[in-house]
């Protein structure tokens, strides 16, 4: 028997007792490692001992053992040392299985410390066959790692394997050598990372000067977009948007888009985003003079217009939410952040909500939304060839919460050519505390890259209107009255 602080423990359970009182770890290999690995009640030290037991046994480990060890790499609540030992064993005995699991799951890891360690190991061990793992990890933002792309552990991993000056070359190799269909997601993520590394010129050269294989729809679509509209997409969302447009938009749409963009001075098209195409189209149909206006002129005029509309009187309540140090809806505080296309979009938004027919439609939707406790209401706003506005109501994908609008596929499909995605905050007629987009709305704008509007009841006869897009950037456009 082993006696610890008055607790009597058998030799078989000494390990658990030692852990219970914090006196250290017992990692001796068990007689049956698989019994430990498949037991959900096993302690971390026992799991680590099981990995040691497998390492000391017949090698390579069999399929069942590899599956259980892979689980330890990703399952929640596993000790860092156990995860690291599992990675080491799999890197030797189940390299392909480890790589495939990491390609899918590295972005889901709940331990950023372990994720960084994995990336460091990939670089230090020269695991070039894990390059896709590094790309997949790099594709998503990790706030604790900061905004500097070259300071991220993924950059360091590729630099260790290929050389600090060859990281873009390694990424271009992924883009060029990955299968256009089976690895479309990987290629889109790689494209976005190269944009973030400021490789725009090289990407433009790739699509304009290189031969593109017939089945490479992504690069073919990008080349046509650059040829016809001069736009280089930057994000995965824009690449999806482009693919949908290429598949569904009519030749007349592309012709009209080209004519609209040719009306825009070249200096306004620097960094032009795909979301700018429906804005330019709408401006050409409704107010073509907007396309020749300067950013400064549009900004100053919009500031004057907003002074008479109660702009910034109402705003959403973000108490308890981390929104960053400069979250604001006031145009006057965002002169440096607002873009030319945002100002054109805001002018169009004011024009449409000043149209009595549009306001009647929005207030009708708002009244029905206020009575419907199952969902928020929303849809898209278009403009036809004659310059007439069209408010298209789209039913939500699911219902069950009066605090959100679950966008269905129909909204996305219609939204690719629409001017605005919109939804209502109409839980109450006096809803000023929700006047503006909130956290879920910011996520939607970031993921779709769309131009968005939210209309909020602040009185029974008054709605507040906010424009927002990715970033997030929000501009309070003031209030409109029931017609």
Predicted regions and their residues:
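Bacterial N-terminal signal peptides
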Residues: 10-22
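Amphipathic alpha-helical scaffolding segments comprising HEAT/armadillo-like alpha-solenoid repeats
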Residues: 27-38, 60-74, 95-107, 128-143, ...
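Short inter-helical turns and helix N-cap capping residues of alpha-solenoid HEAT/ARM repeat scaffolds
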Residues: 42-43, 77-79, 110-111, 146-148, ...
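Structural detector for internal amphipathic alpha-helices that build alpha-solenoid repeat scaffolds
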Residues: 45-60, 81-95, 104, 115-128, ...
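Active-site-proximal loop/helix of nucleotide/amide-processing enzymes and allied scaffolds
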Residues: 207-304, 405-483
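Long amphipathic alpha-helical scaffold segments
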Residues: 263-360
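Short consensus segments that form the blades of beta-propeller domains
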Residues: 367-373
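Short beta-strand scaffold segments in enzyme catalytic cores
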Residues: 374-384, 453-456
């Amino acid at each position: 028997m082993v006696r610890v602080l008055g607790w009597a423990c058998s030799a078989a359970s000494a390990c658990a007792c030692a852990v219970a009182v914090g006196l250290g770890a017992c990692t001796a290999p068990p007689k049956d490692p698989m019994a430990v690995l498949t037991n959900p009640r096993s302690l971390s030290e026992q799991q680590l001992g099981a990995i040691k037991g497998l390492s000391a046994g017949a090698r390579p480990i069999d399929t069942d053992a590899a599956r259980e060890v892979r689980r330890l790499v990703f399952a929640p609540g596993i000790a860092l040392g156990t995860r690291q030992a599992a990675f080491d064993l799999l890197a030797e005995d189940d390299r392909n299985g480890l790589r495939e699991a990491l390609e899918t799951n590295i972005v889901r890891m709940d331990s950023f410390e372990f994720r960084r360690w994995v990336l460091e190991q990939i670089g230090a061990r020269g695991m070039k066959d894990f390059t896709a793992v590094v790309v997949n990890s790099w594709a998503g933002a990790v706030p604790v790692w900061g905004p500097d792309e070259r300071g991220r552990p993924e950059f360091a991993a590729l630099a260790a394997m290929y050389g600090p000056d060859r990281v873009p070359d390694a990424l271009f190799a992924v883009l060029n050598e990955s299968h256009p269909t089976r690895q479309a997601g990987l290629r889109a993520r790689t494209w976005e990372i190269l944009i973030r590394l400021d490789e725009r010129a090289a990407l433009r050269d790739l699509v304009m000067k290189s031969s593109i294989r017939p089945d490479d729809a992504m690069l073919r679509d990008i080349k046509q977009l650059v040829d016809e509209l001069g736009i280089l997409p930057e994000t995965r969302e824009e690449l999806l948007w482009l693919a949908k447009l290429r598949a569904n938009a009519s030749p007349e749409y592309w012709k009209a888009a080209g004519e609209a963009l040719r009306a825009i001075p070249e200096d306004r098209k620097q960094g032009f985003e795909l979301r700018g195409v429906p804005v330019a189209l709408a401006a050409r149909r409704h107010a073509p003079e907007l396309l020749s206006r300067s950013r400064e002129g549009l900004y100053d005029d919009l500031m004057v217009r907003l002074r008479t509309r109660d702009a910034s009187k109402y705003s959403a309540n973000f108490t308890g939410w981390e929104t960053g140090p400069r979250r604001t809806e006031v145009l006057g505080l965002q002169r440096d952040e607002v873009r030319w296309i945002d100002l054109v979009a805001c002018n169009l938004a004011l024009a449409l909500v000043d149209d009595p027919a549009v306001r009647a439609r929005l207030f009708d939707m708002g009244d029905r939304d206020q009575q419907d406790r199952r969902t928020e209401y929303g849809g898209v706003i278009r403009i036809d060839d004659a310059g007439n506005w069209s408010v298209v109501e789209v039913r939500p994908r699911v219902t069950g919460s009066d605090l959100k609008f679950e966008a269905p596929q129909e909204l996305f499909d219609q939204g690719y050519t629409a001017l605005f995605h919109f939804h209502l905050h109409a839980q109450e007629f006096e809803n000023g505390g929700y006047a503006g987009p909130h956290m879920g709305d910011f996520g939607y704008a970031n993921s779709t890259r769309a131009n968005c509007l939210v209309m909020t009841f602040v009185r029974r006869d008054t709605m507040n209107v906010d424009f927002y897009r990715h970033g997030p950037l929000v501009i309070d456009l003031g209030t409109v009255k029931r017609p």
